[in-house]
From Swiss-Prot:
Disulfide bonds: none annotated. Its main location: membrane. A lipid is attached at C22 (S-diacylglycerol cysteine). The lineage of its organism: Bacteria, Pseudomonadati, Pseudomonadota, Gammaproteobacteria, Enterobacterales. Monomer. The keyword Disulfide bond does not apply. It comes from the Bacteria. Pfam families: LolB. This is Outer-membrane lipoprotein LolB. Belongs to the LolB family. The keyword Protein transport applies.
Length: 207
């Protein structure tokens, strides 16, 4: 059952900055090695973060629908996180709270849904097949289960290619926020066939 009036998030025009395709300067030469100590150190620094939060703009584009929203993502512990989507007027459209074995989602009518898999729930209720389980790692600049990826000249992720459950995701990182330590993604794009997901992070708070 789709979320009641969820697609009110479609209020357009979509932010041009969010929808602009990623442009990445490809490093000359073979690129940085995934076996480099700098990359291993960066991954370790990110994994050492206990809590973090970010907010920004979200867009989902496919042949069936075009959705724009503001988002707030907060991780409070291992496998405990909160995702909030609001429409351009600032009203909450979706709030998701996840912890091991339990996921709760509240829609814009106050209807509460529960499940044990956040990714499956989001897909069924919104019609957007967001790879949430992998995105939890990708949004941090970590490859997760992906083994096919490239690094930029600063030993950070620049591209990921990942296939699972019939989906072939390509993730491109358009930039990083170097005001935080370690540097965190500032702009990224996920594509799978005719669907595209854009995330632009305004800022990060890490602990």
């Amino acid at each position: 059952m789709p979320l009641p009036d969820f697609r009110l998030i479609r209020l357009l025009p979509l932010a041009a900055l969010v929808l602009t395709a990623c442009s990445v300067t490809t490093p000359k030469g073979p690129g940085k090695s995934p076996d480099s100590p700098q990359w291993r150190q960066h991954q370790q620094d990110v994994r050492n973060l206990n809590q973090y939060q970010t907010r920004g703009a979200f867009a989902y584009i496919s042949d069936q629908q075009k959705v724009y929203a503001r988002f707030f993502w907060q991780q409070t512990g291992q496998d405990r996180y909160r995702l909030l989507l609001t429409n351009p007027l600032g009203s909450t459209e979706l709030e998701l709270n996840a912890q091991p074995g339990n996921v709760q989602l509240v829609d814009n009518k106050g209807q509460r849904y529960t499940a044990d898999d956040a990714e499956e729930m989001i897909g069924k209720l919104t019609g957007m097949p967001i790879p949430l389980n992998s995105l939890r790692q990708w949004i941090l600049g970590l490859p997760g289960d992906a083994t096919d990826y490239k690094l930029d000249d600063q030993y950070r992720l620049s591209e990921i290619t990942y296939s699972q459950n019939g989906k072939n995701w390509k993730v491109v990182y358009c930039g990083y926020d170097t005001k935080t330590q370690p540097a965190m993604p500032a702009n990224m794009e996920l594509t799978d066939g005719g669907q595209r997901i854009k995330l632009k992070m305004d800022n990060w708070i890490v602990k």
